[in-house]
């Protein structure tokens, strides 16, 4: 509960982004016109990024072997002999050999191979938040006002060359920028203004910043009219799913469906705190907190961004029922490889949480797996056969 209270108070100090490349297709489908086929997809392993408690330096990675059914906690430490750091905040599968992890309060971006071996770090992007990539560069949001010798009034986006792990360009955006996505060469950044409670220089943000990814120049800011655009951003082609937390008092949380082709958006009157996509639909678990009642209200919805049709529930009746039984939903994730759906329960926010997995038909993939404190991010790694 300590961590959750910090989350509420700080608004945005705690919570996988990707590029605009299409999701990987299942194995066995033709990869090239010449008839060459990809290896057969046999299954997948999972990495769970546990944030731990902010400022406690107890973040962890958990690894689930889908072949053996064995969960390994403290995975990064067991592989590398050292801790991952304080509050790992995002994890991104960049390519077949590289995974990036923003470790927020340790002020580093840690790189690992899929076997967990550390293979470098970027250390001059403090208070780093979320990531996306085009395969050559990594784009990272930061709440900080400094990157190396550069200073900024607001927050910024850093562009990192993945060959050298060096920052090659930056662009100042809004106050406390959070989620980031890439579409047709344009970066879309959701700004929160989450420090407005302690910084009198600004209010909560309502803008989405558009940045040219090649030149790293600001194209424009789009005012959404929705405050505190904090949390995960899922992307289904041209559409983005963006959460608006509200102010936990009188301004209610909402969510946006943002169309990157037209740079227009639709607003829905419920939050999408935890959200994911199968490439066509958005699946959301919204968490609404009120200081007046000191209580949470949860929402489960499925949204078709092309038609704006909204349905109650997530995926199927089994998953919806299980989500309703959780004490503290903390992440939801659909694998781009199998379309299996995974989600976590943070429980008390101070002790180990649990990972759950189901097929889209509602079949349980494994018994609930004990992970670590605040399991906030999930990444699937495909297992291929010849």
Residue ranges of each PLM-predicted region?
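Beta-propeller blade signature
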Residues: 61-65, 153-162, 203-213, 254-259, ...
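Acidic, serine/threonine- and glycine-rich low-complexity intrinsically disordered segments
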Residues: 169-172, 177-289
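A short beta-strand motif characteristic of beta-propeller blades
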Residues: 70-83, 116-123, 166-171, 217-224, ...
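Residue position within the beta-strands of beta-propeller blades
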Residues: 48, 101, 140-141, 189-190, ...
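Post-signal peptide N-terminal segment of secreted/secretory-pathway proteins
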Residues: 57-135, 147-148
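Repeated scaffold domains used in trafficking and secretory/extracellular systems
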Residues: 35-36, 83-92, 126-135, 175-184, ...
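Short, solvent-exposed loop/turn segments at conserved positions within beta-propeller repeat blades
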Residues: 53-57, 102-105, 146-155, 196-206, ...
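Bacterial Sec-dependent N-terminal signal peptides
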Residues: 1-46
